Amino acid sequence: MLKIAISGSTGRMGLALINAISKDKDFKLIGGVASESNSNIGKDLGEMAGEKRIDVKLSSKLSDLPEVDVLIDSSEAKFSLQSVEYAKNHNTALLLGTTGYQESDLSNIEEASEFIPLLKAPNTSMGIAYLKKVIDLTSDSLSYFDNLQISEKHHKDKKDLPSGTSLDLANFLSERIVRESPINIESERTGDLAVEHKIILSNDLERIELSHKALDRSIYAKGALIGAKWLKSKPNGLYSMSDIYS
């Protein structure tokens, strides 16, 4: 049984993780953290997420956590750097499901991965990992298309624009397809849309669209747990969700 703690326990992803762990006997939730100002501090994590009581209270300090196998961070970028430092100092595997990092933040993350197994996952959906696999298998011939762009749709409350997933896909494509111009990203924020990311390849004669749509937010929690289980057995290093099926 893998012992898990969550930083950012009260957000959408954090609550989805609590729900998923409560239904999976391979995992045990033994700690959760949120900011000091959070009104849920001191509450039972299970009850907070609408599950049965698990006698694990939400804390405001990473230092309150017991020894864990994997720390999953789904907080904001500025707070997740505390998780990076904590995991590094406590020799704990870390899954970062956070976006919005600055260049200096990425340097800190890469440096920490020399000391711990660290999975950086702006999107923990296995479908996005499979989409990248398709690109890997076909990248040698994709230069046939003159135009390459990414479009994304998110709910109106999504903070980062473009999303971390779109930036990650753009970087992934740029490393595999030689292009002179940058990849354009079109972003839509409205209502409570199902999350969608689309890669569009075209020329004057034809067009291909590779699309991934998240029909339920539980896919991110499920993917994160798959990633956590995989990460625990890995040596120190910086990993992505694509590495799980490489």
Segments the model singles out, each with a brief description of its role:
Residues 2:
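Nucleotide donor/acceptor-binding cores
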Residues 93, 108-125, 146-148:
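Rossmann-fold dehydrogenase core element
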Residues 30, 57-59, 93-95, 117-119:
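Structural detector of well-ordered beta-strand residues that form the stable sheet scaffold
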Residues 62-70, 74, 78-96, 108:
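Rossmann-fold NAD(P) dinucleotide-binding segment
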Residues 99-101, 123-124, 153-155:
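Short, ordered loop/turn segments at secondary-structure junctions
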Residues 78, 84-85, 98-118, 129:
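Rossmann-fold NAD(P)-binding glycine/threonine-rich loop
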